[in-house]
């Protein structure tokens, strides 16, 4: 339905503000654009200023009726709430009709993480004969798992140190990334990931010089790897691994956090490495850690099963 209507001017202005003042990542902006288009579609030509809480409740009911989960609707409401706060500050709008509107409840879902054996099997995969693409993909996936990066953070990495998009410091074994809300953070890079990145740098120098010369990860023709392209390469890699598990980029981040917490028990350190503004976002991994401990107990304790 989004293709049937153009992006309203108020949505375009808000997205431009997010990009300029919040330094929102491209993937974040695309998610906001999609959520704002939903609002425009549901409003059916009415301006945001003309909507009332009853309208928003009706929109939520429609979205839920279309099969969207409570979690997805919560994200959409967050985007709409932010829009209205911007309209109040910058356009003289008086009412935020989204305030106080809650999404339908959904069953709590834990993030899906690979086991340590699955992560090793996936990263040890040799999926195809094209050594250049395999070398690049291995470097990307090793870095995902080694440093717990978000997809947008990895896709945005540049070659030059000091880039506002992020870079890898090979000498120090660290990666600096441009995270959510423009926050920069620096995370260690493990030896296997550094070795894979070094091998990729040798291959990258021989690829086409056309296109984006700044990007760390590029296609065969020299263009920066897009988020969609990275997802597609990981799907191919996962199929070749024979794991029989649907693997997506964020699963590496979940696995990084879960395995680090299992080994260290240091929730605050994991929070810093993930770049979470709130410890509450990190606490979900304590549940994954408990699942791991329960599995160990069930498999190892002589009195675990009757």
Whereabouts are the PLM-identified features?
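Conserved catalytic core of the tyrosine transesterase superfamily
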Residues: 1-306
